[in-house]
Amino acid sequence: MKFRVVHQPTANAARSPFRIVEQTAGREVDWINRYLDYECLRRVAPLTLRSYAQHLLHFVRWWESVHHTDVIVGEALTESTLLDYVRFQSAQQPPFSGSTINQRVAVADRALRATFPDAPKQVAPEFQVSYWRRAPMGLGRPMPAVSRLRVREPKRTIVPLSVEDVARFWSSFHTSRDLAIVGLMLLQGLRSQEVRDLNRDDLRLPEAEIRVPGKGNKPRMLPLAPEAVQLLDHYLRLERPDDPTAPLFVSLKGPARGARMTPAGLRSLFRYHRHTTGVKRANPHRFRHTFASDMLRGGVSLPALMRLMGHAHIQTTLIYVHVTPLEVYQQYARAVAQHIRPIPVIPS
């Protein structure tokens, strides 16, 4: 059997537009689609819902290859079901990354627990961490708990773009729209999805403010850098169709002229300019890291940077912090010179 994800737009807010179906007969995989409907009812973002569907598609393909059916009953689940799924992924060539495996296992675990609450708990001591869970509302003693099954992920360090790389990449753009897009990523730290989701009425150029439709339906107001105001003003005056209600960044030519820029269009834009300039690491997320590093060097505090970047937890912001050994030395020397008083006398 072959399975795939289909997109079926619907006005029903309780039904997921993403469905897992058996490709030959068009039959839906009921237990997965019930879980996707549940997540849709929780109002998760469409991209998150699509990601869940893709992860569960991979899981059901594995399950069918082992059990020769996509139907799951509670009795078929064992304590090692997810561990067997991890073994399968780890044996593939080329191997999947630890983060990909963990994301798939986490989604499959949530879906199975929601659909089959009486199924055996997954047990794999080498892949789980024991901890104490707080009692509800902080009343009563903490209870022992076990984390979800996870494989170890190597720590990744994303190095920001250098000044030279940014200048070379920037110089290859010629339209006001493209310059404004890159400017919002570099000067404001916006995600690619946030840039695409902007509407014309999100801009308040006289006040130098922008309303960002953040990740997880969490909008935030941000101040605009003077350079960003200038780039956006040029785009609005010179290139964008005059429609105050339309999307901010639109296609400028072809049959889709005036329609919101698509993810494929944005990826194609960056791919073309990476090839043109030779700056192979230039992508929207790398510009976001570059923004975070520039803000820290400029003296912005971590709590303020967390708000600027739209993070819910400061631990997420710390991932974007990249400080070179030279910067550590310089900041330490400056702090010692400014704040250690009196300077101790060193005997000769």
Can you name each region flagged by the protein language model?
Residues 309, 314-334:
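Catalytic-site neighborhood detector that most strongly recognizes the C-terminal catalytic loop/helix
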Residues 226-279:
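Active-site/catalytic core of tyrosine-dependent DNA strand-transfer enzymes
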Residues 188, 193, 197-231:
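Conserved tyrosine-mediated DNA breakage-rejoining catalytic core shared by Y-recombinases
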Residues 159-192, 218, 243:
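Basic, Lys/Arg- and aromatic-enriched nucleic-acid-binding interface segment
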Residues 120-168, 213, 252-257:
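Flexible interdomain linker/hinge and immediately adjacent N-terminus
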Residues 32-47, 56-142:
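N-terminal core-binding DNA-recognition domain of tyrosine recombinases/integrases
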Residues 2-3, 335-348:
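C-terminal secondary-structure termini that scaffold catalytic or DNA-interacting sites
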Residues 183, 288-312, 319:
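C-terminal catalytic core of tyrosine-transesterase DNA break-rejoin enzymes
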